[in-house]
Regions:
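N-terminal alpha/beta PP-like core and its mobile active-site loop of ThDP/TPP-dependent enzymes
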Residues: 1-214
Length: 214
């Protein structure tokens, strides 16, 4: 199993059914892994559209919205849409690639294709949390943490950054116990709540801000 397959497998475990994105030379391994899975992959023509689509999907379904993009300018193109998701408390996960670990030099710009110094720092003002993978053994747990963080209250975007060489690298994958995204409440449960309220003589509702997305 390679790194891209680990990401896709973990997204499936988290209940992800749809992913939006734009392919690029750095993230092709992820696209190939998605094409072999049962996750629906929706291609767009601009990275911002991927993030907006993930936002809209999250609002319409209550599920985690996922957008994938490539390194540097591709990732930066999502910022406007991620900012909107932040303001609207939408649970979306942006997965972007980074230059290979073998090409990283702290504090040094090497001019590698699409290299952006501190790429993850672009997302800190508009996300709930930023996750950066530095080694293969961290991958499954970090993907799971990024997904569950976005979906946990208060729901907001998270950002996950994965070096390109880890997408193609293979290793002996081991199952790890990770927290999972909660499923949206079904219509049957809503009906039970309505029945309880209808039978109450003096019902009192204490409603938090999250009710707007319920």
């Amino acid at each position: 199993m390679n790194g891209a397959e680990v990401i896709v497998d973990t997204l499936r475990e988290q209940g992800v059914q749809v992913v939006f994105g734009l392919p690029g030379v750095h993230n092709l391994a992820l696209w190939e892994a998605l094409s072999r899975s049962d996750i629906r992959l929706v291609g767009v023509r601009h990275e911002q559209a991927a993030a907006y689509a993930a936002d809209g999907y999250a609002r319409a379904t209550g599920r985690l919205g996922v957008a994938i993009t490539t390194t540097g300018p591709g990732a930066a193109n999502t910022l406007g849409a991620v900012g909107e998701a932040w303001a609207s408390r939408s649970p979306i996960l942006v997965i972007a690639t980074d230059i290979a670990t073998t090409l990283r030099r702290p504090g040094v710009y090497r001019g590698v294709l699409h290299e952006t110094v501190g790429q993850q720092d672009l997302f800190r003002p508009v996300t709930k949390a930023v996750f950066v993978v530095d080694a293969m053994h961290e991958l499954r747990a970090t993907v799971g943490a990024a997904a569950t963080a976005a979906a946990a209250a208060p729901r907001r975007p998270t950002y996950l950054q994965v070096p390109t060489d880890l997408l193609a690298a293979t290793f002996e994958a081991q199952r790890q116990s990770v927290a999972r995204v909660a499923e949206p409440v079904g219509a049957g449960e809503h009906a039970q709540h309505v029945a309880v309220l209808a039978a109450a003589r003096r019902p009192l509702l204490w409603v938090g801000g999250g009710a707007i997305d319920a």
